[in-house]
UniProtKB/Swiss-Prot annotation:
InterPro entries linked: SAM (IPR001660), SAM/pointed_sf (IPR013761)
Name this polypeptide is given: Sterile alpha motif domain-containing protein 15
Region (Disordered): 1-448
Tree of life domain: Eukaryota
UniProt-listed GO biological process terms: signal transduction
Biased composition (Acidic residues): 1-18, 276-290
Composition-biased stretches (Basic and acidic residues): 87-142, 195-223, 236-274, 291-322, 330-346, 354-372, 391-429
Classification of source organism: Eukaryota, Metazoa, Chordata, Craniata, Vertebrata
A Pfam match: SAM_2
GO molecular function, one term: protein serine/threonine kinase activator activity
Stored SUPFAM superfamilies: SAM/Pointed domain
Domain SAM per the UniProt entry, residue ranges: 545-608
CDD domains: SAM_Samd14 (cd09530)
Length: 674
């Protein structure tokens, strides 16, 4: 192993920065010093999430912070004597077993100095990421097994004093991959070639997409540490659907479910974040190689789906996305890297949550296998929309089918009508036929009695009448008496059939007469309710006559010579009330006989009755019409609008109406207008 030169000194600030890391490092070093490869495999299998997943975001974050250039691999060949790649491979395979406790004590102090100078050199281009590393020492100290290893390998592979930033960037890029490849070899498949494992490491190293998604835009756009502190709650969002699917699929899978599910769910956000990093701004990452990351994306699209094809059929459409749509995605996502990465990550989270709600993971796999030949752009956001409408259509069509089937099967009203039509006539017809048969069979026995054709016709007509009434459903009361009569006719068949004939005919006629009388009474009662007002209007229509009409009426009575008298005195219909024998001489009519005739006709027209001395005094007579006409004779708004019914109600003369006879007497006369 190559030692650090003696000339190398670290500043006091550098040692002070990493003081919180020192108490936690020796324990972790001893864990890997004394561990053999077998025990390392067990420890890695037990803690895949703690040891494997946590270092990756930190180390990958540092890789992209440094902006790993193409020279990262070429610089490895600069030191004379040994090649960086060979030593890196040796350290990849033998680091856990070759490390010795004596060397680790030296390395521990050296690593602290190296890390101090490393962060000091990174202060100028990246102040914010330097603040992240200063403010998060506990997070680095816990998973820093791989950092310690790559620092040791950095000490081994630095025979010449190279500037610390270059050596750290080189060693971090190489040893992080090598260390994680070693962990992957122990976890997954020991016989897989190194290249495929390296590709898998590059993918799984980026598995927590929320960190990489948030780290790349924050480095490029210079986001503050406060934004990066908000990352842990974003990590917890996709973990909940992942854990629920992990429980359902742990029994059927051999690979670590969390890694595979992360690859399956969030390959698109990783791809977008990596492609967003292809052309970074010149200030922060001037030397990021495009070819190297394009190789990573192409290898991801080609090699990894072959390995995970039986478990995750959705990699096939995503492979075609890598092949078909690299250029548009580069153009779009370089313009808005942060927005695109967030959108794609949110879409995948929404897809997973929507897919988990209606279906189980097995059904999701089946639907994905069926929809593999579809274009890849559709499979992302369109899958839940395709699955959900199917479920909705099924759930909607089932109740509609039931609803459509129910009226066809049950139909209670129609069956009730059919039964009423079918069942009721049958027993009646049977009785009727039995009655005919009995009558016909008994006729020759008696010899004297025979049913005439006329009786038969009427009998059949009666049956048809019964059926028609039954079908209409109006005269159900007629059926029961008819059946009783039929039974009576059967019992009385020994007697003269003319008697039964007459009884039936009489009954039918009586029933029809009763029905007609009831209908007439109802109609008359309705007419009585509506006609009184019309009758009163017609009765007192003459009150609306003008003087010309009154003069015409006088001429019709046979007194045309008095027309001018009525016109000149303006005798209208309402003034006829006051025309009597005492008033006619004032108008110029002096003939007594003519006066009596005109007075009598006006009383008849107005229906004014003279009191009769012969009538009973049990109920004193009240001339309702006379009193009404007395009120109507006055001029005014009330008298103009007054009607007989209103007058009777207002005067309280209901008891004295001609139709009603009441014992009580009301002798008070209503007040009249002055």
């Amino acid at each position: 192993m190559a030692e650090v030169p003696e000339d190398y000194d670290s500043g006091p600030d550098e040692d002070g920065e990493l003081e919180p890391e020192r108490p936690e490092l020796p324990g972790l070093h001893k864990l890997y010093e004394n561990a053999e490869p077998d025990t390392m495999a067990k420890a890695d299998s037990k803690l895949p999430a703690e040891i494997y997943q946590e270092p990756q975001p930190e180390t990958e974050e540092e890789d992209f912070k440094e902006g790993e250039p193409d020279s990262a691999k070429n610089v490895q060949l600069k030191p004379g004597g040994t090649s960086q790649e060979g030593i890196a491979k040796e350290s990849k395979r033998d680091v856990p077993s070759e490390t010795e406790p004596g060397i680790h004590q030296e390395v521990k102090s050296e690593t602290s100095r190296e890390m101090g100078e490393f962060f000091k050199d990174l202060e100028a281009p990246m102040d914010e990421t330097h603040k992240e590393s200063d403010l998060e020492p506990p997070e680095e100290a816990k998973p820093n097994v791989t950092e310690d290893v790559f620092l040791e390998s950095a000490m081994e592979t630095d025979p010449d004093p190279v500037p610390p930033t270059e050596t750290m960037s080189e060693v971090s890029g190489a040893t992080v991959r090598e260390r994680n490849l070693e962990l992957l070899e122990e976890e997954t498949e020991p016989g897989v070639p190194e290249e495929s494992l390296r590709v898998q490491h590059e993918e799984t190293g980026l598995e927590p997409p929320e960190q990489t998604k948030q780290d790349f835009p924050s480095e490029k756009l210079g986001e503050s540490l406060e934004e990066t502190d908000l990352q842990p709650p974003k990590m917890t969002k996709p973990e909940t659907p992942e854990e629920t699917q992990r429980e359902s699929t742990e029994k059927k899978r051999t690979e670590p479910p969390e890694q595979a599910r992360l690859e399956f769910l969030e390959k698109e956000p990783r791809k977008s974040s990596e492609e967003a990093g292809l052309e970074p701004p010149e200030e922060t990452q001037p030397e990021v190689p495009e070819e190297m990351q394009r190789k990573a994306t192409e290898e991801k699209g080609t090699e990894l789906p072959e390995r995970t094809k039986p478990d995750f059929p959705d990699h096939k459409p995503r492979k075609s996305t890598d092949e078909n749509v690299p250029e548009p995605l580069e153009e779009i996502k370089l313009e808005f890297p942060e927005e695109e990465s967030r959108k794609t990550n949110e879409e995948t989270i929404l897809e997973q949550s929507e897919m988990m709600k209606p279906e189980s993971p097995e059904e999701i796999r089946k639907s994905n296998e069926k929809k593999n030949p579809q274009p890849p752009e559709e499979t992302g956001p369109v899958l839940p929309q395709e699955i959900n409408p199917q479920v909705e259509e099924k759930t909607q069509t089932k109740p509609t089918e039931k609803i459509l089937e129910l009226p066809d099967e049950t139909k209670p009203r129609e069956t009730h009508v059919e039964f009423s039509k079918e069942d009721r006539p049958e027993p009646i017809k049977s009785k009727y036929s039995v009655g005919n048969d009995e009558l016909e069979h008994r006729e020759p026995k008696r010899g004297k009695l025979s049913l005439s054709d006329k009786f038969r016709k009427e009998y059949y007509a009666l049956g048809s009448l019964r059926e028609s009434e039954e079908s209409i459903g109006t005269h159900y009361e007629f059926l029961q008496p008819l059946q009783k009569l039929l039974n009576v006719s059967e019992e009385c068949s020994y007697s003269d059939p003319s008697e039964s004939q007459t009884e039936l005919s009489e009954f039918v006629h009586e029933k029809e007469v009763v029905d007609l009388s009831q209908e007439l009474k109802e109609r008359v009662s309705e007419d009585d309710e509506t006609q009184p007002e019309k009758g009163t209007e017609l009765q007192f229509e003459h009150l609306n006559w003008d003087p010309e009409e009154v003069a015409e009426w006088i001429s019709q009575l046979g007194f045309p010579q008095y027309k001018e008298c009525f016109i000149t005195n303006f005798i209208s219909g309402r003034k006829l009330i006051h025309v009597n024998c005492s008033n006619l001489p004032q108008m110029g009519i002096t003939n007594f006989e003519d006066m009596k005739a005109i007075s009598r006709h006006t009383q008849e027209l107005l229906e004014i009755e003279e009191p009769l001395f012969k009538r009973s005094i049990s109920l004193p007579y009240r001339d309702i019409i006379g009193l009404y006409l007395e009120q109507k004779g006055h001029t005014g708004i009330k008298s103009d609008s007054l009607t007989l019914s209103e007058f009777v109600k207002a005067a309280g003369l209901q008891d004295y109406a001609p139709e009603i006879t009441a014992p009580e007497e009301n002798e008070e006369l209503p007040c009249t207008e002055p």
